[in-house]
Amino acid sequence: MASVAAKREGPQFISEVSVRGNGAVLDYCRTSVSALSGATAGILGLTGLYGFVFYFLASFLLSLLLILKAGRRWNKCFKSRRLLFTGGLVGGLFTYVLFWTFLYGMVHVY
């Protein structure tokens, strides 16, 4: 009975389809938060370094929320924890700047 109750030792198998699906969800979350935070920064009138600091704070907050959501068993969903922090960071920056400049121009220039 002890052998049945013991945990199975060996390599952990990961579904590539699930990993890609989780990556797509992360990209969607990162893009959505980038657009929302860019719009917020534009409406608030942030300029220069304050705007970029706002993006990195919003991105860091999203990463913390994703880590909390994944919990202790993050390795069942992702290959590495670094993906939760850096995945889509640069692509999100381009989305952020697009919404930031658009909303800043609409609210404060026109």
From Swiss-Prot:
Keywords of this entry: Endoplasmic reticulum, Membrane, Transmembrane, Transmembrane helix
Topology feature Lumenal, residues: 45-50, 107-110
Ranges annotated as spanning the membrane: 29-44, 51-71, 90-106
Quaternary structure and interacting proteins, as annotated: Component of the ER membrane protein complex (EMC).
PANTHER family: ER MEMBRANE PROTEIN COMPLEX SUBUNIT 6 (PTHR20994:SF0)
Membership in a protein family: Belongs to the EMC6 family.
Protein name as it appears in the record: ER membrane protein complex subunit 6
Source organism phylogeny: Eukaryota, Metazoa, Chordata, Craniata, Vertebrata
Gene that this sequence comes from: emc6
